[in-house]
A protein has these predicted regions:
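Extreme N-terminal basic, low-complexity initiation segments
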Residues: 1-11
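Charge-rich, low-complexity N-terminal segments
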Residues: 25-161
Length: 161
C-alpha cells in the first residue's frame, strides 16, 4: 500500500511495506571473514630458460624473491541455523584461517618454506586455489566456500568462479 502526501509543493510517495515472516531454514546467507598475511615468492618455471622466465614473469622472476601484503577474503555461504542464527561461527572461522592459512604462509617464502609450492608456481591464482583446498575439508558439504585473494590493492583473484 502506498500513501501520497504533499510537502513543499512537491508530491511525495510514502511506501508502506508489509514484511513477511522469515523462516531461518530457508535463508541462504554469505558470511565473509577477512585476513592478512605477508609472504615472499618467485614466479619461475624450471623447465624454461632464464630468458623465457624473465620475459614471461618480469620482475616477479627476481632470483632473490619479492614479497606481497596479501589480503584474503573467505566467504562461506549456507543456510542460517535456526538454533544459533549463524551460517557459521565467525570466531571459529577466524581461528581456522589463522591456523590453516596465516600460520602456514605469513612471513614465509612460499617457494622455499611451504610444501604446497615446492613444485607449484606460487602465482596469485595458485595460492588462491591452494587456500580453498586447505579450508574446504573443514566445512560441511552443505556450505559453499569462495576465496578472494588480493595480491595488490588493484589485483585480485577468486576461486571458484
Amino acid at each position: 500500500m502506498a500513501k501520497v502526501s504533499r510537502f513543499g509543493g512537491k508530491q511525495n510517495v510514502i511506501c508502506r511495506v508489509k514484511t513477511a515472516s522469515l523462516e531461518p531454514t530457508s535463508m541462504k546467507v554469505a558470511v565473509i571473514r577477512r585476513a592478512h598475511f605477508n609472504a615472499a615468492h618467485r614466479l619461475h618455471n624450471p623447465a624454461w630458460t632464464d630468458e623465457r622466465n624473465r620475459t614471461v614473469f618480469g620482475l616477479c622472476n627476481n632470483a632473490n624473491y619479492h614479497g606481497h601484503n596479501y589480503e584474503l577474503e573467505v566467504k562461506v555461504t549456507g543456510e542460517v541455523d535456526p538454533a544459533t542464527g549463524y551460517v557459521i561461527d565467525l570466531g571459529w572461522l577466524a581461528n581456522l584461517i589463522k591456523q590453516e592459512v596465516e600460520n602456514r604462509f605469513d612471513h614465509h617464502n612460499l617457494n622455499l618454506d611451504t610444501v604446497e609450492f615446492r613444485d607449484l608456481n606460487p602465482t596469485a591464482e595458485n595460492i588462491c586455489v591452494v587456500i580453498w583446498q586447505i579450508l574446504r575439508p573443514h566445512l560441511p558439504e552443505t556450505q559453499d566456500l569462495h576465496i578472494r585473494l588480493y595480491e595488490t590493492p588493484r589485483n585480485f583473484v577468486e576461486y571458484p568462479v
